[in-house]
Amino acid sequence: MRIKKSDFITSAVKKNQYPIDNRVEVAFVGRSNVGKSSLINSLTNRKKLAKVSQTPGKTRLVNFFLINDDFYLVDLPGYGYAKVSKAEKDSWGKTVEMYLTGREQLKRVVLLVDSRHKPTGDDIIMHEWIKHFGYDVIVVATKSDKLTRNELKKNEKVIKETLKLNSDDKLYFFSSLNKDGKDELIDNLFLEFATDLD
């Protein structure tokens, strides 16, 4: 499928601010500065659809983007940034938890990890939490252009072992810089929810 149209619709903190048109939602979650905004911009061919912040932990809202007038891509606040207060961390945690708990429109959660590093304790908890609530989860390892082919192979093994991925679990490597595998990634993330398959 092709992403021909992408529009920012709304930012939300509370449930009553979420869209109410019952379209399917695919949520993106990951550590602060894992490259979430860059990935969203890359997939949609929009340089500034999702704001790329140089300051980790800046995205504190749940952001809804309408794709092809068909389904929502949902950008969740990043977690795991050390240099914020406990109150702010708790607030972000509640925002994410509120969205992920009992959201019927949410059909898939895409967990982003940094391909250069072993997944963190926060990544492991988030992966287990997503699976516990029964959501379909796909892991995308970002910034893969920074690794050699040998390093990619080695790190793929580390990511799979750390997150305890089985043979059915999906893991994709992606670089927002060179966009290798972009079409395949779009199909794997969104195709089954799209009504316009062009």
From Swiss-Prot:
Q: Origin, by domain of life?
A: Bacteria
Keywords, sorted A to Z: Cell cycle, Cell division, GTP-binding, Magnesium, Metal-binding, Nucleotide-binding, Septation
**What family is it from?**
Belongs to the TRAFAC class TrmE-Era-EngA-EngB-Septin-like GTPase superfamily. EngB GTPase family.
Taxonomic source organism: Clostridium beijerinckii (strain ATCC 51743 / NCIMB 8052) (Clostridium acetobutylicum)
GO cellular component term of the entry, any: cytosol
One Gene Ontology MF term = metal ion binding
Q: Which cysteines are joined by disulfide bonds?
A: none
Chain sites annotated for binding GTP: 30-37, 57-61, 75-78, 142-145, 174-176
The regions listed as transmembrane in this protein's record are none
Please give the biological process terms from Gene Ontology that the record holds.
Answer: division septum assembly
Protein encoded by which gene: engB
- Per the database record, which ranges form the EngB-type G domain? 22-195
Is Magnesium found in the keyword set? yes
In terms of CDD domains, this protein maps to: YihA_EngB
Pfam family name, one: MMR_HSR1
Name by which UniProt lists this protein: Probable GTP-binding protein EngB
Which residues are Mg(2+)-binding? Answer: 37, 59
Entry annotated with the keyword Cell cycle: yes
Task: Enumerate the cofactors the protein uses.
Answer: Mg(2+)
Q: What does this protein do?
A: Necessary for normal cell division and for the maintenance of normal septation.
